[in-house]
Design a protein with these regions (language model features):
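Generic N-terminal amphipathic, Lys/Arg-enriched alpha-helix
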Residues: 1-2
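A short alpha->loop->secondary-structure connector
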Residues: 109-115
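Short active-site loop/helix that positions an aromatic residue
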Residues: 99-109
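Conserved small/polar residues in nucleotide/adenosyl-binding loops
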Residues: 118-120
Length: 120
């Protein structure tokens, strides 16, 4: 691994820990992928973010072959297809915020409140 790859792997872990700290994720749910070389780096399946090391992040190459000591996230295909289809994206973040999940279970709409969503 190059220094740059190690740096990106560590940034993925930092982002996962931040998601958890901010309540956007709990336990082993959710995942992050980053475009890397001809494929992507992605969080492993079933591993908690606490104690995760750079070597635990999985590389999935352009032929969808995983490289690493763990299996890639169970949602790796969805990450892979997004990064393949949308060249302007360099990362995919998938999380399970408690309130969003609760609203979904209750079948409640979540209203969008952001200036970019206001139609003039």
């Amino acid at each position: 691994m190059t220094k740059n790859e190690i740096k990106i792997r560590k940034q993925i872990i930092e982002a996962c820990l931040l998601m958890e700290k901010k309540g956007l994720n709990q336990g082993k749910a959710g995942n992050i992928s980053v475009r890397w070389k001809d494929g992507m780096l992605i969080t492993p399946s079933g591993i908690s973010y606490e104690g995760m090391k750079a070597k635990d992040i999985v590389f999935v190459d352009s032929k969808t072959k995983p490289h690493g000591i763990w299996k890639p996230s169970s949602e790796w295909r969805f990450h892979f297809d997004i990064l393949k289809a949308r060249k302007e994206f360099d990362a995919v973040v998938h999380n399970h915020p408690a309130y969003g999940t609760g609203m979904s279970i209750l079948r409640k709409d979540i209203k969008a409140y952001h200036l970019s969503l206001i139609h003039i």
